[in-house]
From Swiss-Prot:
One of its GO terms (cellular component) is cytosolic small ribosomal subunit. The keyword Ligase does not apply. The gene is rpsO. It comes from Karelsulcia muelleri (strain GWSS) (Sulcia muelleri). InterPro entries: Ribosomal_uS15 (IPR000589), Ribosomal_uS15_bac-type (IPR005290), uS15_NS1_RNA-bd_sf (IPR009068). This is Small ribosomal subunit protein uS15. It comes from the Bacteria.
Amino acid sequence: MYLNSNKKKLIIKNYGLSEYDTGNCIVQIALLTFKIKNITNHLKYNKKDFNTERSLQILVSKRKKLLKYIEKKNNTQL
């Protein structure tokens, strides 16, 4: 269950303001979450795949930074 163009368009349509809204933080977080779930599932069966484990750490870090940005942005708007 990998991220192909149809699934990517569906995620963007569900979380974005329009179907072309790929830069929105919420859309980026949703796409990263989908990738993280797939990689986590892959690592359950391939425990010694250390390169994929490292890429998972990078994706989790990116998502964490985006979540922190959204939290900071929402607090300043209030």
